[in-house]
Design a protein with these regions (language model features):
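Non-catalytic accessory/interaction domains
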Residues: 1-186
């Protein structure tokens, strides 16, 4: 039995995931020296507000964070002062919306080659989904693409291609944005 082997109540963890539709977005933000984590159901179109909660295995690269986010919101102090990645091995079923400070740290790690190809692809894919859902501006996606200027991994380039395709829908009427997108896409 998985519960015996792992020492965790796998049945209770999985029940929520298989009994309710959708999946969550976790907002990660820094506030007065604390890390705030908040979960909501992720939507890409018109929707009614949802009060659904999931037990979310965070799989953070910072071991001080809890293994599972069970509440709607949780605050942790002190906040990590370096790179923070949630779901850093891409093993959980949620997306993360980082605040500007955390996002800037990730983009710096992408530009410097610190993240693995899988982590780079995951981050960019999440940004595409967040832009489609209206949770981040398409300009945030353009900013993210700039960090991939030296990208060499084929899989990551497939995700970059998806991002550029999505962005073309928004920049056709904006000459400055179109020029920037052309410069980024070569």
């Amino acid at each position: 039995c998985l519960s015996q082997a792992s020492g965790k109540d796998v049945g209770a963890l999985m029940n929520t995931w298989i009994s309710q539709p959708g999946y969550p977005v976790v907002y990660a933000s820094l506030d007065n020296g604390e890390l705030a984590l908040r979960q909501e159901q992720f939507f890409t179109g018109p929707h009614q507000p949802s009060d659904r909660l999931w037990p979310i295995p965070l799989d953070a690269n910072d071991q001080r964070l809890p293994e599972i986010l069970k509440e709607r919101e949780q605050h942790l102090s002190p906040a990590p002062d370096g790179l923070l990645l949630l779901n850093h091995q891409n093993a959980s079923h949620f997306i993360t919306c980082y605040d500007d400070t955390l996002r800037a740290r990730i983009l710096q790690a992408i530009a410097s080659g610190t993240l693995t190809p899988s982590q780079r692809a995951q981050y960019l894919n999440e940004q595409i989904l967040l832009a489609r859902g209206g949770l981040v501006a398409s300009s945030t996606l353009v900013e993210a693409l700039a960090a991939f200027q030296n990208e060499s991994d084929h899989t990551v380039w497939e995700i970059i291609s998806l991002a550029i395709s999505d962005l073309k829908k928004f920049v056709d009427q904006d000459e400055a944005a179109e020029k920037l997108l052309r410069r980024l896409s070569g």
